Swiss-Prot record:
Record organism: Chlamydia trachomatis serovar L2 (strain ATCC VR-902B / DSM 19102 / 434/Bu)
Keyword ATP-binding: yes
Protein's name in the database: Histidine--tRNA ligase
Enzyme category, top tier: ligase
E.C. number(s) listed in UniProt: 6.1.1.21
Length: 428
């Protein structure tokens, strides 16, 4: 019987050290997730957690013709024949949760989440059937400064984790009237060459016209480049809104580029849409994206409420950090006590608890190996500090702590050592 995982999923494991799989090390994930929590807290966003599965109808609202709904959802019937779906994206679930808690709804609702998503993706680099998304939803306010604020938050997150060569690509899809005018122009443009488009784009021509612009098929690129720009169809009010957002990005020093071909893969987006991309030479790929979805709450049975949000795939963020040579440590600042005999065992057990109460992450090596082997294990496992305790240390009450990264030591009485460790941990 094979214990191998199904395709498209993976373990986030604490002891991974091989370069190929280092991105799966749980210490890296904790650091990136901590940055997301910290930045969202600074901007006044609160965490939300929705169920792993919901009624299928919740996710149909993202668009019956979107790739997610048509091809990628994990849907099943429960024992009573009810259709349920594993969460493929966060926005629809958050909107559903907000409406379910309507008594607690505010005029300005600010949520973020770090949750697994499930999609039946084609097997390729950077895509997984269970992936993890850092997402944010701001529901209730329509203002160009809100859009700029959310983009600023996202930019601060990328800076906090150490991503480089980032740029925001933006477009403006407009509301229903703008989209109707643009759809008419786009349909007329593609009609004369419809049989030369890829099969997928021919299908989208009849079901979801705008998504042709998102095609990666080689035979479509010539036509996409020549297609009308939606920016020629937005009215003065939309243009003023778009310009106001761009002015704030410029003031914040956030590099951006206008991409009139940019659309999103879900049908609920309106007005401003964006992708955050990393650009290295001629190669670029998205590390997140989102935009405004002012009609989704009403389409979900709620009041008319404007909204703006984004989603960031954490797998790709962590992989990119490592590709860019970011020196992410897979270890935490931790002390390992190594008792050399049974008498030291009891002291180490007691002292470890005292150190933890002081805020010092402390573990005890109970193996009673030879000191040389215990020190080698500590070095291999990237332990920050090591303290060997035997008969002499207990008799003199003088302890030596080795700093494994600096290859230096400091020593002193118990209280002095504790104060030094607290300082080292707080100033790491």
């Amino acid at each position: 019987m094979s214990n191998a995982l199904p395709k498209g999923v993976f373990d986030i494991f604490p002891y991974v050290t091989s370069p190929k799989n280092l991105w799966r090390n749980s210490s890296l994930w904790k650091r990136v997730e901590h940055a997301a929590h910290r930045i969202c807290n600074l901007y006044g966003f609160d965490e939300i957690r929705t169920p792993v599965f919901e009624k299928t109808e919740t996710f149909l609202r993202v668009g019956e013709h979107s790739d997610i709904v048509k091809k990628e959802v994990y849907t099943f019937l429960d024992k009573k024949g009810r259709s349920l779906t594993l969460r493929p994206e966060g926005t629809a679930a958050v909107v559903r949760a907000l409406l379910d808690h309507s008594a607690d709804m505010r005029k300005d609702n600010k949520f973020y989440y770090i949750l697994p998503m499930f999609r039946y993706e084609r097997q390729q680099s950077g895509r997984y059937r269970q992936h993890h998304q850092f997402g944010l939803e701001a529901i209730g306010v329509r203002h160009p400064l809100r859009d700029a604020e959310v983009l600023s938050l996202l930019w601060d997150f990328y800076a906090a984790v150490g991503l480089q060569h980032m740029q925001i690509h933006v477009n403006f899809l407009g509301g229903q009237k703008t989209r109707a005018r643009y759809d008419e122009a786009l349909r007329e443009f593609f009609r004369k060459d419809l049989d030369r488009l890829s099969p997928l784009s021919q299908e989208r021509y009849h079901a979801n016209l705008l998504r042709i612009l998102d095609s990666k098929e080689p035979e479509d690129q010539e036509f996409i480049e020549k297609a009308p720009s939606i920016l020629d169809y937005i009215d003065d009010r939309d243009l003023s809104y778009f310009d106001a957002v761009l002015a704030q990005l410029k003031a914040l020093g956030i590099p951006f580029a206008i991409n009139p071909r940019l659309v999103r893969g879900l049908d609920y987006y309106t007005d401003l849409v964006f992708e955050a991309v990393t650009v290295v030479g001629e190669r670029s790929y998205a590390l997140g994206g989102g935009g405004r979805y002012d009609e989704l709450v009403a389409q979900s049975g709620g009041p008319s409420m404007p909204a703006f949000g984004f989603g960031v795939g954490l797998e790709r963020v962590i992989q990119t950090l490592l590709e860019q040579g970011n020196s992410l440590s897979t270890s935490t600042r931790r002390l390992r006590l190594i008792p050399m005999d049974e008498q030291a065992d009891a002291f180490c057990f007691s002292w470890a608890n005292r150190l933890r109460n002081l805020g010092i992450a402390t573990e005890v090596d109970w193996s009673h190996k030879k000191p040389k082997l215990s020190l080698k294990d500590a070095a291999d496992q990237q332990v920050s500090f090591v303290c060997l305790l035997g008969e002499q240390e207990l008799a003199t009450k003088q302890f030596i702590v080795k700093d494994m990264s600096l290859h230096q030591s400091f020593s002193g009485a118990q209280q002095d050592v504790e104060q030094r460790l607290v300082y080292e941990v707080q100033n790491a």
